[in-house]
Amino acid sequence: MRQKIVNIFLISLLLSSFAEAKSSDRNQAMDINADHSDALLTDDGDSSISGNVLISQGSLQIYADKAVVTRVKGDTSKVTLSGNPARMQQTNDNGELMKATAKQIVYFLNTEQINLLGGAVIDQPRGSMRGEVIRYDIKSGRLTGGGDGSRIQMRLEPKTQAKK
């Protein structure tokens, strides 16, 4: 039971900072389902949840083969989701569905940066971005891709006109 509480706490730290998340999601219960859990009750080290990982909180859904939470001096510093691919989806406050997939999704809490590595795709109503590496800076909202010798593909959708 104590291990389950630790896992819920660690995963909640991952989910609490997504910039465009539906704000009401943070106030809802979180459900975590997986085949296996291996958590440390210390201030330093890695804890993992593996096997058909499903994490849901409100409109946020995360699917992965494995989730690893890294703690340094008692604070969560990094969360790594891996899968074939790892997938995230969430509805924002405007009711728009946002999706992200990659072989590995790494969230650095200290720098508020998310790296999508390996077949990365971000889809949202305003457009999409695809590449081997996509970086998302939560503070600035900046998406960067490429620069590693691979190419990126982007699609920008026109702004919809308000109905009269």
Region roles according to the model:
Residues M1-K164:
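Mature-chain termini and adjacent capping regions
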